[in-house]
Structure formats: C-alpha cells, structure tokens
Amino acid sequence: GDVSIKEVVEMMLDNFENKVYSRFKNAAPHDFNETIIMASMLEEEVRTPKDMKLVSGILHKRLETGVALQVDATLVYIKCSLLNRPDCRSIANTDKEIKSLYNTYLYPGLPPGPISNPGLTAIEAVFDPEKSHYLYYLSARDDGRTIFSRTLEEHNLNRAVYR
C-alpha cells in the first residue's frame, strides 16, 4: 500500500529529469543553475505563460546590457524567507536598499540562487523568451495583470495609474 517518502522523491526526480533535465544534458552546469534561477523569478513575478515569455525577454535584455534586473519578487523573497518580516509582501522604496546578494535592485546579474521552485512554464519561458520593444513592466495592484512599457516615462506613468 503506502508509498514511502523515498519513492515519492524518486518519482519527483524522474519527472523532473523527463521534463526538464533532458533539455540541459548538453549544457554547461552554470547554464542549468542560471536557467532555474531566472525561472524562479518568473514564477514569482508574473502569472501567465505569455507574460512569463515577455518578462523573460526583458530580463535577458537587462542581463546582456548589464542593467540591474530590478525584480520585485527578489525583494519579497529577502523579506519573507531570509528576514522573516511580517510585512514581507508589500514593497517600500527603502527595501530596494536592503544589503543582500538577492537584491536585484542593488546588484546586477542574477541572484546567487533560486527564489522559488519554478514550474515547467517558467523554465520554458527562459528557453523561449519573447522578443519585444518593452524595457519595463509592473504588476497592476488591482488584478495582478502585467503592464508593459517601452520607455521609462511610460513606465512611470503606468506606475502612477496601476500602483
């Protein structure tokens, strides 16, 4: 009858290997880690597969140009998981100054590790980013949908409207 914890873990690892690892078998080890880190941010940052692909494209552009990723979900991770703050879901401007390698506002590049356990959709979005003219995005406060912008001016207007 009962399935042991070891059997459950083996099934999960087999499933992971079948769905994900096969795509990495010829990749360098750092590529695997970087993909999982990026996917973990997408998993926490946006909701829909289409938005994940668009945000993946934006984050790839930021990585290529050395611009800070500025992923709010990393601040939530720092506050909730690393600092155990009770107000961890809301973000204040002062949070962008928290000294942590996971702070993608202070430190360019990817954080040192994943911030969540990404799903297959987020991992696929890292492999298949959607190219666009967008450079900025935010989540609307009321319904969580992602609002994209081409310029900082447009982004700041969207922040005033949607946040």
Task: List where the protein language model places each region.
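Bacterial extracytoplasmic/cell-wall-associated proteins, especially those involved in peptidoglycan
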Residues: 1-163
